[in-house]
């Protein structure tokens, strides 16, 4: 007998879990279909393990770069990679248990397996069919790989989290935040690290101040940056090492090569054609602002839609979808404007709103006023390894409404959230000026710029 549900989510990542739990809280009969571990990319091979590794790299940097000038004997005999990975795994296991407990409390049926559409209301999982009035596609994304000879010798971000040991020489290929974060972590943990970017700098879509400062720090502290670097081939050598060959004739030999050139939607194995769901030329599911696909009763959230590929975005969109469908809020939807984001680089980056070039293009040069601050992060100021901290406010109009907030430096990852609330609420430069600073902090620079 075919089992019927009010709501089914395909994919047990951030968006699927958030949406299905919210629907179940409103009394809907729900099922979540996931073939792998709960939590999706974020928990298993993304945000969570990445942040653990970032913390580990920070600890090593604190010991070796800053500890001596603070008076500490920083002699360390060894670093145990296995201990770090075991601690990380235990933490992720606790998150899995938490998800299982919440889903169980909400009476959500968790079905282990791969789902495929039979038609717009029917799915096939493990040889059985199930139906639903509403179906959410939250299948996420996966790493992309270049089409070059020897590509199989490299690993991707998923593979990084499966490494049994930290190798001595590592190359990361990519210019986006994933590449920057991985290269920063590996460099911070002590490996000889190379970052290869196709054009003149990493993070080119960010405000120029961010990218320029990041390059400045990389040139001083690593990883070694290779610009205008287009991969041509990868050769595996007799000793097991890998040589990355570039189109311009340059090459670099390393022990491990990581592809971090972007991500693509994981929509190709669920038989969307049987349901009639439309995708764009890149394979992303086409949705409107309410997360509706072109087929009534089928929705999509998260990385498989090509929207902002961040965990909190998928969570927020998924919850709002369930509020609209099951809590009598017909206009509930996620506002995708002014979404804050942090890059866990070394040092961290925080940004929300328009970059300076975007603001000038949108409003005109005569309507834009920019405030900047540049200083040495206090944490590093008493050491020989001084690191810059730079901040920018982008304001428009006679009232100087703040439309962009950007920063790079120690603590930026934690301080941005509150300032993002202010920008979202329409704060002006005068509002910031009227706020008394907290001293001594880096955050005070945002309310004392002149």
Predicted regions and their residues:
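Hydrophobic/aromatic ligand-binding patch that stacks against planar heteroaromatic rings
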Residues: 18, 22-23, 42, 135, ...
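Glycine-rich dinucleotide-binding loop and its adjacent helix/turn
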Residues: 47, 139-192, 196, 224-225, ...
């Amino acid at each position: 007998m075919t089992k019927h549900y009010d709501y089914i989510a395909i994919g047990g990542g951030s968006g699927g879990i958030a949406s299905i739990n919210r629907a179940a809280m409103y009394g809907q009969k729900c099922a979540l279909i996931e073939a792998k571990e709960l939590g999706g990319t974020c928990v298993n091979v993304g945000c969570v393990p990445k942040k653990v590794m970032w913390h580990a790299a920070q600890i090593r940097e604190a010991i070796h770069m800053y500890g001596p000038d603070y008076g500490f004997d920083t002699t360390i005999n060894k670093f145990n990679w296995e201990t770090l990975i075991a601690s990380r795994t235990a933490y992720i296991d606790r998150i899995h248990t938490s998800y299982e407990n919440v889903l169980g409390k909400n009476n959500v049926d968790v079905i282990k397996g791969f789902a495929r559409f039979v038609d717009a209301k029917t799915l096939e999982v493990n040889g059985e069919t199930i139906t639903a009035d509403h179906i959410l596609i939250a299948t996420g994304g996966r790493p992309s790989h270049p089409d070059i000879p020897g590509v199989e010798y490299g690993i991707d971000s998923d593979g990084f989290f499966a490494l049994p040991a930290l190798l001595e020489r590592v190359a990361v290929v990519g210019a986006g935040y994933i590449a920057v974060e991985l290269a920063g972590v590996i460099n911070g943990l002590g490996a000889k690290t190379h970052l290869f970017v196709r054009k003149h700098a990493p993070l080119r879509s960010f405000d120029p101040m961010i990218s320029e400062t990041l390059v400045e720090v990389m040139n001083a502290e690593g990883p070694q940056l290779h610009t205008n670097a287009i991969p041509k081939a990868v050769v595996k050598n007799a000793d097991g090492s890998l040589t990355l060959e570039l189109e311009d004739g340059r090459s670099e030999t390393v022990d491990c090569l990581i592809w971090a050139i972007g991500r693509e939607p994981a929509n190709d194995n669920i038989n969307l054609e049987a349901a009639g769901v439309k995708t764009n030329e890149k394979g992303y599911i086409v949705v409107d602002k309410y997360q509706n696909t072109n087929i009534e009763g089928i929705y999509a959230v998260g990385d498989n839609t090509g929207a902002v590929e961040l965990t909190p975005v998928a969570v927020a969109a998924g919850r709002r979808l369930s509020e609209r469908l099951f809590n009598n809020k017909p206009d509930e939807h996620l506002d995708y404007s002014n979404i804050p984001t942090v890059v866990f680089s070394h040092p961290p980056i925080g940004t929300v709103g328009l970059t300076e070039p975007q603001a000038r293009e949108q409003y005109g040069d005569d309507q834009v006023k920019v405030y900047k601050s540049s200083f040495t992060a206090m944490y590093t100021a008493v050491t020989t390894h001084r690191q810059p901290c730079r901040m920018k406010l982008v304001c428009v109009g006679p009232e100087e409404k703040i439309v962009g907030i950007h920063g790079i430096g120690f603590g930026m990852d934690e301080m941005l959230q509150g300032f993002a609330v202010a920008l979202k609420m329409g704060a002006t430069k005068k509002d910031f000026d009227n706020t008394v600073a907290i001293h001594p902090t880096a955050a005070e620079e945002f309310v004392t710029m002149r």
